[in-house]
Amino acid sequence: MIEKHIVLEDIDPVVFYGVSNGHLQMIKSLFPKLRIVARDNVIRILGDEEEKAKIEEDIETMRKHIVRYNTITEEDILDIVKGRKTKADAVKDVLVYSVAGRPIKGRSENQQQLIDAFDKHDMIFAVGPAGTGKTYLSIALAVKALKEKAAKKIILSRPAVEAGEKLGFLPGDMKDKIDPYLQPLYDALEDMIPAVKLQDMMDKHIIQIAPLAFMRGRTLSDAVVILDEAQNTTPAQIRMFLTRMGWNTKMIITGDLTQIDLPHAEKSGLKEALSILNHVEGISVINLDKKDIVRHKLVTRIVNAYEAHDKADKR
């Protein structure tokens, strides 16, 4: 009999084998005609040829499940081996699972529209107040595309202008000055990708995070590209960014038109782009509002209070 070797690629073997090898022992019990030996990320199988073909197919399904969701349960394994409906079929609305195992998916009608728009359009503008999940959901869509090999890399960017601070007046070298502006993007990625794997992807430039100015002169192909806080771009900056789009690339531009930190005389590039590109074929504009806020319930009350204050000021 020929021994079959299966390599667990793109996943943490510990997740596959389970706590105290619980998953592995379960798989062995489901295939009593086979001798199964696991070492690191390689599984060696000896025994009945038909059973070997079946387990190879099932292990690949389990591997893909872990790639997408970062986790797998004994119930999932049983469903896969027994040919019942898998978790992947049952929760198609889940984009990815967080490192902690929490499902990440659209939680409102407008968030679902953003997800649907990503499937149908190459460029999406997601506009709405703080807490509506526009950035987090966009990054989840990018991570999903990367895991499913629909994209080769993720590129995340922000304009380095916020809260009235000028980079030249901040202490430290350029990295020290820039990193605080990009931290929300790191936070979202760390929630979805294990730390060691994330660092490896960044070292290999599979995931890139950079200020908007670093995009100049580049053509961004085979990627999901996200521009966050786009309300703080100038018209020239956002025009430069949008024209970086290359083949097999999707762009998501997020922003909140109520939080523009540009000097008063400067026009928001996002505001101008929305008025110019609103009806261009291939571009989708998704407007999120306070009904989509998924942070602490106080955030909704704060947004409502400021909206009322702004309306009173205009009278």
Give the location of each predicted region.
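Flexible glycine-/small-residue-rich
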Residues: L8-D10, A38, G47-E49, R158, ...
